[in-house]
Amino acid sequence: MSKPKRERSLPENEAKAIARMLRVSPQKLNLVAQLIRGRKASAALADLQFSRKRIAGDVKKCLESAIANAENNHDLDVDELIVSEAFVGNGMVMKRFAPRGRGRSGRIYKPFSQLTIVVRQVEAEASA
């Protein structure tokens, strides 16, 4: 006996992927998320491929996962996908201490972030 299946929270033409415990501040991660928001999935992958930001590789991995979820789990056409949402959330913060002068110590924050990417299939517009 198992639990009843939960209803799908996304519409039928959307798929998502979540990356948790990314070792970067949410502010820096949001700079990369803004690059891909609203773009075609293929163009977003190309942008991330050549981005010089360190976290761009992890964002690319999450986007590839969202595209694979759309293709394999929801039977969506990969060529018609756009990044409809890319948002960043706070994760945990590791706190460390660094020795300072005169026997004191300073606190160092090492933040983590969460990234959610939602891809949506848009119908190809009929060109007349």
Curated annotation (Swiss-Prot):
Keywords: Ribonucleoprotein, Ribosomal protein, RNA-binding, rRNA-binding
NCBIfam families in the record: rplV_bact
Assigned protein family: Belongs to the universal ribosomal protein uL22 family.
Name of the coding gene: rplV
Protein known as: Large ribosomal subunit protein uL22
Source organism of this protein record: Nitrobacter winogradskyi (strain ATCC 25391 / DSM 10237 / CIP 104748 / NCIMB 11846 / Nb-255)
InterPro entries: Ribosomal_uL22, Ribosomal_uL22_bac/chlpt-type, Ribosomal_uL22_bac/org-type, Ribosomal_uL22_sf
Task performed by this protein: This protein binds specifically to 23S rRNA; its binding is stimulated by other ribosomal proteins, e.g. L4, L17, and L20. It is important during the early stages of 50S assembly. It makes multiple contacts with different domains of the 23S rRNA in the assembled 50S subunit and ribosome. The globular domain of the protein is located near the polypeptide exit tunnel on the outside of the subunit, while an extended beta-hairpin is found that lines the wall of the exit tunnel in the center of the 70S ribosome.
HAMAP family for this protein: Ribosomal_uL22_B
Gene Ontology BP annotations: translation
Entry GO terms, CC: cytosolic large ribosomal subunit
Subunit structure: Part of the 50S ribosomal subunit.
Alphabetical list of CDD domains matching this protein: Ribosomal_L22
Domain of life per record: Bacteria
Transmembrane regions listed in the UniProt entry: none
Molecular function (Gene Ontology), one example: rRNA binding
